[in-house]
Amino acid sequence: RDFIAKEVTPVYHEWETEGHPPRKFYNRLGDLGILGIQAPEEYGGGGESSLKFNVVVTEETAAAGVTFGSYSVHSNLILPYIMQHATDEQKQRWIPGFASGDLMFAIAMTEPGTGSDLANISTTAKLSDDGSHYVVNGSKTFITGGALADRILLVCRTSPFDPENRRGGLSMLVV
């Protein structure tokens, strides 16, 4: 509560005008241990497995009539994907910065014409001829956290659409 009262509420109107908090705000959340509370300690996080701390943040910000910008998507949506699907090398590369606020993530799922119906997305990613990278083609809207993102978790189709298995061929890439 003190943090919100002293460091968020007085400048919140500026964030609203700008459309997002300043980048240094996320570093401050990292300093306080809020941003990476569920990241494993071995990667610089708080090591908490419970969502209770995230619920406290949600309740306190709601009571003050403010938000922490893309904090919720960064911490509650993207981190679990990284923890479940990233390689150990990727976790070592991304999670320390994720927890400190030095590396901000956004998520790109929604597309014009399909909304968040992921089974019908048309954004594609094809492996380059030399196999070193993917070439992405398509459109996304409502990229939550995109204004300050260093990395974007992108949902795309890496195999052709199959009407018998509409979700087949969907992948998540970090770009």
Say what each PLM segment does.
Residues E42-G44, M109-T114, T141-F142:
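Short, solvent-exposed loop/turn elements at beta->coil junctions and helix N-caps
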Residues R1-S72, E89-R93, G97-S100, M104:
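Amphipathic, small/basic residue-rich leader segments at the start of a protein or domain
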Residues G69-E89, G115, L127-D130:
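N-terminal glycine-rich flavin-associated loop
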Residues G101-M109, V155:
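A short, Trp-centered hydrophobic/proline-enriched beta-strand micro-motif
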Residues L79-H85, I107-A108, A119, F161-D162:
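Flexible, glycine-rich active-site loops centered on histidine and acidic residues
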Residues D117-N137:
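Cytochrome P450 C-terminal beta-domain/meander region
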Residues W94-P96, G113, S122-T124, K140-T144, ...:
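A generic local secondary-structure boundary/capping motif
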Residues S132-V175:
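A short core secondary-structure module
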